[in-house]
Structure formats: C-alpha cells, structure tokens
A protein has these predicted regions:
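Short helix-loop-beta connector
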Residues: 127-134, 156, 212-213
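N-terminal ligand-binding/catalytic initiation module
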Residues: 1-113, 121, 131, 290-293, ...
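NAD(P)-binding Rossmann-fold cofactor-contacting core
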Residues: 153-176
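Adenosine-phosphate binding glycine-rich loop
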Residues: 16-18, 224-320
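Glycine-rich Rossmann-fold phosphate-binding loop(s) that bind the pyrophosphate
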Residues: 140-141
Length: 320
C-alpha cells in the first residue's frame, strides 16, 4: 500500500512567503476568494476557537475547501505583545483537492497578516472615494503597518494620521510610516475618508459621531465576540462582513451592537448588492478560512515552478 513520505513534505517559511507574496496579486486573490465564498462555492465551518486554560490566549482551526483546499492552525497569545514572539502564530497545510495528499506546509503568520489587510484594501478599492484626502490608522501594531502598505496599493492620500492607545508606541509608528500622530482619537478620525481600526481594544475606540459621511471604516483589530472597537452609532451604518455566519457568531462589533448586516463583501464584489450612494461603510472583519486558503495556494503556486527538477504539474511521489 502506497503512502506519502511526509519527511519530504515541503515547508515554506516566512522568509520565502515574504519573497513571493505581493500586495496586488494578493488583493485580487482575496477579492476572488470572498466572491467564491458568497456564491456558495466554498465549504467552510465557522472558525473553531478553543480558549487556552490559564493563558490570555486562544487556539483555532480554520479549514476550507473552495478552488483550493487547506487548513490553518493558529494561536493568538495576547501576552506575547512586546516580547520576541508574535501574538499570532500559525501554519497552513495545503492539500491536493483531487486526491487529498498534503502538498506543503506554509508559515501562517505573515499570510494571516497580509490577507487581513488585503481584505480591507479590496473593500477600499471598491467603495472608498476615488479622491482620498485623509487616511487614519488606529493602532500601532502589525496590522497597522500592514494596512498602511495595503491601502497604499489602492488609494493615494494627502495626509496619513495615526492614533494609538499607547502614545509612545503610536508616535514611533507614525514616524516610521511618515504619518502625523494624534493624541485625541476624535481629532484623528474627523474628516478621514478611510479609517482602519487595528487595535486589541475590548471597549469602543471609534464613535460613529466622529465619522465623515461616506467614509469607509475597516475594523480588523478585535476578532472575537467578547470585545469591540466600534460603538453602536458606528455600527448603525452600512455594515459589510466576510461571512454572515462568522460575523454573527464571532464579531464583538456585530454581537454587541445587534446591528443589521447589509451584505457580505463577496456580494459587493460580484455586483449582487450595491452600497447606497454616499453611505458610510463599516467593513467588520473577523477573518475567514477561505482567505487563508486562497493566499496559501497563491504562494504555493508561485513557489512550485521555482523548484529544480520538479515540473509544476508533477504529482508528489508516494512511497511503497
């Protein structure tokens, strides 16, 4: 009976992922994955979250089958912030959809970082004003930086603003990305065309009363049901999510406000639904597995042709 030699399973580490994964292809891939999901062409359970006893942490499994098939195993350890370890760590196992064979194991930290910001950029590309004067980043961590990079791929702006709960780190981040730091959150948000909320705040940091009509807000920082970044007034706007089921089950912004969800992002991208003219849009993201699966498959497909002595269409060998 043949079986796979798992010792030969390719491992694609973060450095290699970084060399292969570029923003524009990833933004396009993420948009297509969300369209595929909303069209009903993805089999995916709601993310399975397991609290880690005695730790300020969770462990999660995120499988999905769409055009590609993979599963992400991820941990979120909040107390790693400020240490040598990242708060998010994970791996993604890409599988052959035709025969179930493992194809490669990929580092999941950078893919998670980039696909999250790519989702925001895809929404901003579709819904943000064509002419953008002000972009505000709320936060100073990994997602704050990723959002600066991703949003720069889809819009040019005149002013970049930063607000953060930690003033020292916020100022350092603002200096690094060429932004103006604001001590006052309201002042930072007023008149902004795009606002990216990327914090781990459990209580609202953004109030709807501050928002410019027609602004696009991307909220990605707190993705479990026991915390929220946006208040009820903010969530009373036109709310877009990746998945109705995932948002209702795991979004603190949605659950805490009991808001109406207007559409899934994939429905907007495919033209099934249209945002009303002049609407203020809230993209509330919890992250869904098909985004990781699509990003990982993109990396794998870019990596495979570069391997010496292996044809891009060659199957992995089984050992007898």
């Amino acid at each position: 009976m043949a079986h796979l030699d798992l010792e030969s399973l390719p491992i694609i580490g973060e450095q290699k992922v970084a060399s292969l994964l570029k923003w524009q292809p990833l933004i396009d891939t993420t948009e297509n994955a969300l369209k595929e999901f909303s069209a009903g062409d993805v089999v995916q359970p709601v993310r399975q979250i397991v609290p880690v006893p005695g730790r300020n942490a969770i462990f999660a499994a995120m499988p999905a089958v769409g055009t590609a098939m993979a599963v992400k195993i991820v941990t979120l350890y909040h107390d790693n912030a400020g240490t040598a370890l990242p708060t998010h760590q994970g791996v993604i196992l890409v599988l052959d959809k035709d025969n179930g064979s493992p194809l490669a194991l990929l580092d999941g930290r950078l893919i998670t970082e980039m696909r999250t910001a790519a989702g925001s950029a895809a929404v901003a590309r579709r819904l943000a004003p064509v002419s953008v004067d002000v972009v505000t980043i709320m936060g100073n961590g990994v997602q704050a930086g990723a959002h600066v990079d991703a949003l720069a791929e889809v819009r040019k702006w005149k002013e970049l603003r930063v607000w953060a709960r930690n003033e020292t780190k916020g100022r350092q981040f603002a200096d690094r990305v060429g932004a103006r730091f604001f001590q006052d959150a309201e002042a930072a948000v007023r008149d902004a065309d795009i606002v990216a909320c990327t914090t781990a705040a459990k209580e609202p940091i953004l109030r709807g009363a501050w928002l410019k009509p027609g602004a696009v807000v991307t909220a990605v920082g707190w993705n479990t049901s026991d915390g929220r970044e946006l208040d009820d007034d903010a969530m009373a706007n036109t709310v877009i999510v990746e998945s109705f089921d995932a948002a209702r089950d795991q979004s603190g912004n949605v659950r805490g406000s009991n808001c109406e969800i207007f559409a899934e992002a994939g429905e907007i991208f495919s033209g099934l639904k249209s945002v009303p003219d002049g609407a203020t849009v809230i993209y509330d993201s919890v992250g869904i597995a098909i985004m990781d699966v699509a990003a990982a498959k993109l990396v794998y497909d870019l990596w495979l042709p570069k391997q010496e002595g292996r044809r891009p269409d060659a199957p992995r060998k089984a050992r007898k």
